Amino acid sequence: VNARLAELTQKADCPFATAMVENGDYIVSKTMGAFSLVVLPKPGQDVKAVQTAMEELERAAQFGLTGTEIQRAKEEIYSAAEAAYNNRNKQQNSYYVPKYVRNFLENMPACDIETEFNLYKMLQQQLPAESFSATLKEFVASTDSNFVFLAMYPDKEGISVPTTDDFKAAVKAAKEAKLEAYVDNVKQEPLVPVLPKKGKIKKEEESLFGYKCWTLKNGARVFYRQTDFNESEVNVKAFSWGGSNKLADKDIANSKLFNMVFQSTGLGNFNATELQKKLAGKQASVNASLSAYSEGLSGSSTPKDLRTLFELIYLRFQTPANDPDAYNSLMTALRTTLANQEKVPETAFRDSIFATLYDHNARQTNLHVADLDKVNYDELRRIYSERFNAAGDFDFVFTGNFNVDTLRSYVEQYIAPLKAVKKRESITDLNIRPAKGIINNRFVRAMETPKATIARFYMGETPYSLKTAAVANALGQILTQRYLQSIREEGGLAYSVGAAASVSHDLRDEYAVQVFCPVKPAQMDSALLLMDQGINDIAEKGVTAEEIEKVVKYELKTFADNQKENAYWEGNITNYIRWNNNDVEGYEE
């Protein structure tokens, strides 16, 4: 049912931004269950949204669910359960804690993964397809005797709230509507209809951190490392210099929407809805992204779905699918979301931070409703084709549980045949720098509940080394602890305060120290004085041996834990490839 509702949202004229059903507690009650439909209407379409969502629920109850829908749902649940089962011996605390909480609060069985997986396999085989439709029909109320309707709105002037009779009429109209059975349109063709001729690996060599590197004939480089940290995980990351810095100023708005658009639209010959159905039961995804300096891909799969991962990589380097329905649906939803965000004082605060730090540079601003009027789907597709024109300009990183021979075969089949480049693009520096000098920006906005937020930034250039990076990291942690003591515990000025410090090495060697603290407006100046005092004390007197000991203990524990994380090694090899950084060797010393 949720898949049907999500499919409706891909249409630009859908009156709701999102809608979903769930079977669980009745609101906050732990002693009464309920089958619920939750609807988030688009502005001014509240009644229509309720009627449309209810009609879809009634359609499913009247005509039942199709066999292909049920099969896809089974495959989705099974593939997720299988991935958890395959990695059952390497679960972290975050997996176990919620289980025991539910066991204590709700008397839910705290089963191990193996038991859950075996139960699911048994139930999946025993439940006939018609039982799902029968259960749904029981869930959907046929009379008003067991039906509750709740509508919640902000208590603000100017908000138009439909009447109870309006909503009753919408529900009545949905129940009395003459509906037709849902048609499950499924595209049967392969993701990649015609396989390209295999390409070749030109060179093999060792790299850092246990990675090896294949240089392909088309110019692409593939770094790979086999691990057994997670039995069900293979990660991929790819990147090429270029990014939004290569775009003209007229494309700034397009660049801000790039990531969202191409994560929401289809691939190859499949629109977004068709692709979602095609990938049912597959634990594989690949997203494209555009940043200031580069464009890239990021994705993951299970070992079982590695071929699908490579098919998606291959499709990401083809002409992007023309999916105007998904694009228009996204734009409509964004107008609602951004309009609501712009009413919130915190949005103005975030905007002011960027405007202050980067002197109102248009490339360093957040997305606003006004930007949407400057975005053009055809231009976005043009930008995509330019930025992802040739895989030969990219470096790929694969980390996880895979067979090297299988990986080699897929690299030769899906990456090596892609377009080559004679010369790789170089990084483009637009000379966007933080504003210099001491700048104070204090502004006031009307708020129902008055509050203030302090954001402080200390930024500049300093030579990078592994030691300075470690020292900066320690500074942020120690500042946080000192501010918690002086501002929260002793001063009683705030519930929370946090600091972070870093030294980066990319185009320039820079440092940044940031402090955030929400306070009552009348106590803001007092908090600022304590902030100054805290950082000045460290500058003049240094830190204590006890503070250093705590940081070192925490960092060494984190470092040891990270040795078994695919994402940690992926991040470090990526940092090395892009910036020639080695933040692993010598870190403990």
Segments the model singles out, each with a brief description of its role:
Residues 387-389:
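Conserved alpha/beta enzyme-core scaffolds, especially Rossmann-like or related mixed alpha/beta domains
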Residues 323-329, 421-425, 543:
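Conserved short beta-strand edge segments in small beta-sheet-based binding/regulatory domains
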Residues 126-131, 135, 322, 327, ...:
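Peptidyl-prolyl cis-trans isomerase
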Residues 1-2, 6, 71-75, 79-82, ...:
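Proteolytic maturation boundary segments
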Residues 479-483:
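Short Ser/Thr-interspersed hydrophobic loop/turn segments at strand-loop and sheet-helix junctions
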Residues 5-62, 68-126, 145-154, 223-225, ...:
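M16 family metallopeptidases and their MPP-like homologs
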